[in-house]
Amino acid sequence: MSEEDWQVSRRLFAVLQGGVNSAMLYISRLPPDEREKYKKDFKKRLFDTETGFIKRLRKAEGIKWSFHTRDYYIGYVREMVAGSTTSLSLRMYIYISNPLWHSQYRPGLKNFNKEWPFVNMWIKTGFMWDDIEKQNICIGGEVSPGWGPGMVGIAIKAFSCGERKIEATPVMIIRGEIDPKKWCGDCWNLMCLRNSPPKTLQRLAMLACGVPAKKWRGCCNQRFVSPYRTPADLEVIQSKPSWNLLWSGEL
């Protein structure tokens, strides 16, 4: 490799650490005959970096199956947690932007955080904070001072699908006020978990009235409505644990 090529590669790697927008801006200024070459090289470097991060995160957090999108415009990876090694864990779909996702906020039925981010997942499918840096939560991809370990697994976007959830109750079903089959199986599971006592006939009846949750294989039955999707979106890791006991436990 010539000295000039080495300098270009070194600059490209430095830009990669600074964020994707800067890197693409740098590549766009290259001569046309070099642009495609370095664009391809950059995407490969980015893919390898993100894949390594995701693998380490999955290993550290015990995530057994997941799918994820790569939101390049932010400059760091967001992983969508879709399941864990715990048989009692809830299938809860949350984008996280930092590997500080520990037991305090991990979605399980015994250590379940009922206030945040569940409430945000319940009422909103967009960004929690569009001005996340001004909120002094996360600056430049790093968690701001004052947030202890386990406090910030920043849920920027969280939802099971785009259908709006409601406070459904068994009485509403009996009266015919709602159609349980309007929602997908995953949404209906969440609604039943939120609005029925654990290990009760009411919960089992509510679950039976809805659409059964589909097995996630090959491709999920939802789509993420985002203008920032990439060809690597919806990569599915097909080794999910059993989830027969999704609705057991206490909230």
Curated annotation (Swiss-Prot):
Annotated GO biological processes are:
viral life cycle
User: In the record, which residues are listed under signal peptide?
Assistant: none
**Keyword line:** Host cytoplasm, Virion
The Gene Ontology CC terms held by the record are:
host cell cytoplasm; virion component
Could you tell me which InterPro entries the record lists for this protein? Answer: Vir_infectivity_fact_Lentivir
Where in the cell is the protein located?
Host cytoplasm; Virion
Q: Indicate the family of this protein.
A: Belongs to the feline lentivirus group Vif protein family.
Q: Name it.
A: Virion infectivity factor
The gene for this chain is vif
